[in-house]
């Protein structure tokens, strides 16, 4: 396979590697080409510095992935760790964990309700045991953590790749202090920090972006993250068709209702045909949960890209028209025109101005929308079919299609509260000796007794199943 190397943020060049090629071997190839010592090179990928003893497969490097290699003399205490030698983080029983690669970060837990604080980093599902597709590297999971809308060759929703760059020099040479644990960490600028490894760059702020994971991409090709779309790892039924499908869209209502993408497309087109989208002054033209839940309008309007190009163009047109109407304007009634106009409040005669090729020149009556006339309008008909009709959803289907309910059931079956801080902690095999993952707590306690870890627990039921 081919990976592209950008040395000291210059133009990239291809390097041929195998899945079992080590990072140090990659350094040696680059060092020979650039005429520099291999031990002064640092390989940066997806916000993480890659260790010498890791392989291309370990690092989730795919065909035509772009890695950054910078030349920086080692500072005291760094060289041993980078070589894969006596790194205290690798000691058996050590409590410190390697910062998780962005290629394996899962933010789907952050669609849980606000009262489930902490689960994004504490609760991990076991539903990723799908067998890898044919042709994928051994052991590589097909679980997708992110979804994007690819405006490039795909023109559809695709699995996405999370990447990070330095907000100062805009190069992907920043190593994160810690990985993101929720969508806010990724979507809110300057929320996460790190250290830029580019020479002479003092940058410390992280800037995240997404790429389409279905095809090789260049540095400049980015895609918009659709953070309401998630892999259906909890096997929730769709609120409309009641099938279990994946991926799904999880509405931001209190129940976190789930809808499959085909039904979401149908829901949007139906509402669009009836012009029953909601115009929100802050958000724009949007839709609420299909069950009509309060405070559930979709905030990231790129989710409506699921409509496809033709329907999305209609959505944008109707949204612009609705904006004009909300501002007190009118639409030209001549067939084939429909231009938005903003006449004076007491102006009865409205002319669709033909300047700049935008208007048709038609003069019409503001009251009856017919060709302009003197005197009273002959008839004014009330528009028919403008009443909002509820999208029919079966109550039982709505009850079963809740992301929140599956989460709470998982928590109930696989977790116990920490005796000190009461945060839910998952036990997935292993011994009875637990350690609270909350940095402010870190209590060592017994899963069996529910009390602080002691010699009695150690001698009596340390390794009970």
From Swiss-Prot:
Q: Where is this region: Disordered?
A: 77-99
Q: How does it assemble?
A: Forms an E3 ubiquitin ligase complex with UBE2L3 or UBE2L6. Mediates 'Lys-63'-linked polyubiquitination by associating with UBE2V1. Part of a SCF-like complex, consisting of PRKN, CUL1 and FBXW7. Interacts with SNCAIP. Binds to the C2A and C2B domains of SYT11. Interacts and regulates the turnover of SEPTIN5. Part of a complex, including STUB1, HSP70 and GPR37. The amount of STUB1 in the complex increases during ER stress. STUB1 promotes the dissociation of HSP70 from PRKN and GPR37, thus facilitating PRKN-mediated GPR37 ubiquitination.
Q: Which residues bind Zn(2+) 4?
A: 365, 368, 373, 377
- Tell me which EC number(s) this protein carries: 2.3.2.31
Record note on what altering residue 431 to F does: In PARK2; impaired E3 ubiquitin-protein ligase toward ZNF746 and BCL2
Q: What is this protein called?
A: E3 ubiquitin-protein ligase parkin
Query: Where expressed (tissues)?
Result: Highly expressed in the brain including the substantia nigra. Expressed in heart, testis and skeletal muscle. Expression is down-regulated or absent in tumor biopsies, and absent in the brain of PARK2 patients. Overexpression protects dopamine neurons from kainate-mediated apoptosis. Found in serum (at protein level).
What post-translational events are described? ISGylated. Conjugated to ubiquitin-like protein ISG15 upon IFN-beta stimulation. ISGylation positively regulates its E3 ligase activity.
Q: Which gene encodes it?
A: PRKN
- Where are the annotated RING-type zinc-finger regions? 141-225, 238-293, 418-449
Q: What is the effect of changing residue 65 to E?
A: Phosphomimetic mutant; still requires PINK1 for activation. PRKN is activated in presence of phosphorylated ubiquitin
């Amino acid at each position: 396979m081919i990976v592209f190397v950008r040395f000291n943020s210059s133009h990239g060049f291809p390097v041929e590697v195998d899945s079992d090629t080590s990072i140090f071997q990659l350094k040696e190839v680059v060092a020979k080409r650039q005429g520099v010592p291999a031990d002064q090179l640092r390989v940066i990928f997806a916000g993480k510095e890659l260790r010498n003893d890791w392989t291309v497969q370990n690092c989730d490097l795919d065909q035509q992935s772009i890695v950054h290699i910078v030349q920086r003399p080692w500072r005291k205490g760094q060289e041993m760790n980078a070589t894969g030698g006596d790194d205290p983080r690798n000691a058996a029983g050590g409590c410190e964990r390697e910062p998780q690669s962005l290629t394996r970060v899962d933010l789907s837990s952050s669609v849980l309700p606000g009262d489930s604080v902490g689960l994004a980093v504490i609760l991990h599902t076991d539903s990723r045991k799908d067998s890898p597709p044919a042709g994928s590297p051994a052991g590589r999971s097909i679980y997708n953590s992110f979804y994007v809308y690819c405006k490039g060759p795909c023109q559809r929703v695709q699995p996405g790749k999370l990447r990070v760059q330095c907000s100062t020099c805009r190069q992907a040479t920043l190593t994160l202090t810690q990985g993101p644990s929720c969508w806010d960490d990724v979507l809110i600028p300057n929320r996460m920090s790190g250290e830029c490894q580019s020479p002479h760059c003092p940058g410390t702020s992280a800037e995240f972006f997404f790429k389409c994971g279905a095809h090789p991409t260049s540095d400049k090709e980015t895609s918009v993250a659709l953070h309401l779309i998630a892999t259906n790892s909890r096997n929730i039924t769709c609120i409309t068709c009641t099938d279990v499908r994946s991926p799904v869209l999880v509405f931001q209502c209190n129940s976190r209702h789930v809808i499959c993408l085909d039904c979401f497309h149908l829901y949007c087109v139906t509402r669009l045909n009836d012009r029953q989208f909601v115009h929100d002054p802050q958000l724009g033209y949007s839709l609420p949960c299909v069950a009509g839940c309060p405070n559930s309008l979709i905030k990231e309007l790129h989710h409506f890209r699921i409509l496809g190009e033709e329907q999305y163009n209609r959505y944008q047109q109707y949204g612009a028209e609705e904006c004009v109407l909300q501002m007190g304007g009118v639409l030209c009634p001549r067939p084939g025109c429909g231009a938005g106009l903003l006449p004076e409040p007491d102006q009865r005669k409205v002319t669709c101005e033909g300047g700049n090729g935008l208007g048709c020149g038609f003069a019409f009556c503001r009251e009856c929308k017919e060709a302009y006339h003197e005197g009273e309008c002959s008839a004014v008909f009330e528009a028919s079919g403008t009443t909002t009709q509820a999208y029919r959803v079966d109550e039982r289907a709505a009850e079963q299609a809740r992301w929140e309910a599956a989460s709470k059931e998982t928590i109930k079956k696989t977790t116990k509260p920490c005796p000190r801080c009461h945060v839910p902690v998952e036990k997935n095999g292993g011994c009875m000796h637990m350690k609270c993952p909350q940095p402010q707590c870190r209590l060592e306690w017994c899963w069996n007794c529910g009390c602080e870890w002691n010699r009695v627990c150690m001698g009596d039921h340390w390794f009970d199943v």
